[in-house]
Amino acid sequence: MRPVLAFFMLLGVAAARTSAPTAAEIMQKVAENQDRGQKERLAYVYEEHIDVITRHTNGKLAREEITDYLVTPTAKGVNKKQLAVKGRYLKKGQYQSFAGDPVPGGGEGLDGSIVESFRHDLTEDDSKDGLGKDLFPLSTEEQKDLKFELAGEQVVSGRKAYRIRFTPADRNELTWAGEALIDEEEFQPVSVYTRLSRRMPFAVRALLGTDVPGLGFNTQYKRLDKDVWFPVSFGTEFRLHAVFFINRIITVSMENRNFKRASVDSRIEYGEAAPPSQ
């Protein structure tokens, strides 16, 4: 009898050892990989394509700017060199098209300011992968005020992934909540979806006339090499109400593409390099 009991006890220990990690353990490994992976992501040159659109609430386009950048590694991070900019905007009932700098009305007026602000946020030079680090809870710093839940597993492009839900530890805090798919083998993000954890406070909506219904972000990642994953697409569309009279629908999309691994020597020269080959 004792050998039988011992056998089942060993089975229980083995099962415990092979059971899925907790959501907190999974995200801790993700954070460690993100913190450690900064150097690996600096080994790549790539192009960044950004499209920002503002529309009136009736759906009529107010302004659109499409910008392409070449992203290259530097000693302190990355350098983003603008390759092209084009777009159109509504002026006196007619659409005016433009290409190249200076951008007409860039940073001026309501729509020019909105477009420039979003474009600047997406092209911050401190980001190693083209996205502001405060948008997603992937690094150690961004995870400290969140709680996580393992919601299941699924297969994405032939690879198993954990489905992790996240919410603020303080339910009264206005910050990000959402869901992430995490690769089970390398503990890297496959996709991340975020939304505001709750509505704007009533006082802000009532007294300041400000709200952002539908605000959230959706990002897809791609595996370039072992333990090296990059965001390859980013998108959001939401409505902006601000100080009673500002009312716009804002659409933002970003695509990272044409990745090319840089050699040690090319890192020094890539500041003035030509775009990667198609």
Locate the predicted segments by residue.
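Positively charged n-region of N-terminal signal peptides that target proteins for export
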Residues: M1-V4
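Structured extracytoplasmic
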Residues: R17-A177, E184-V190, R195-L215, R223-V232, ...
